[in-house]
């Protein structure tokens, strides 16, 4: 899969600046992914986000989108605004839907998914062989579906 042009990923407050594109490795079940800095329009880095392209069992639990905002920039909906831009990139890859997941105790991330009108599918137990369970001792994920 090729990396698409991402220069359109901006609005009147933020822009997503491509950090890396990972082509994926299907032999180990890794899908292609984009990693971005979330920046203001002067390109000051305020956080990071990523978009994973495609579908597999792991993405149901891990999600297609991940994000983090530096503490001094929190409270301005920058993660939600970045997600809306990533939705547009996902559409360019002909994705019809995607998942965003959050830990049940991560109230901020769950609020972002609700703010974005994601369909709450429920709280799911991670499979025993899931990397997040093995490496991070996580056991459950709130899973939200977004139809694009």
Predicted region positions:
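Conserved active-site alpha-helix within GNAT-family acetyltransferase domains
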Residues: 105-122
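Conserved beta-strand segments that form the floor/walls of ligand-binding pockets within enzyme
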Residues: 37, 50, 64, 68, ...
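Conserved acetyl-CoA-binding loop-helix of GNAT-fold acetyltransferases
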Residues: 67-69, 75-88, 111-115
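Conserved GNAT acetyl-CoA-binding A-motif
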Residues: 91-101
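Residue-level signal for glycine
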Residues: 43-45, 82, 118
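Conserved catalytic-core motifs of GNAT/GCN5-like acyltransferases
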Residues: 101, 119-136
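Acetyl-CoA-dependent GNAT
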Residues: 4-60
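Short hydrophobic/aromatic beta-strand or adjacent loop that forms the aromatic wall/cage
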Residues: 33-35, 137-143
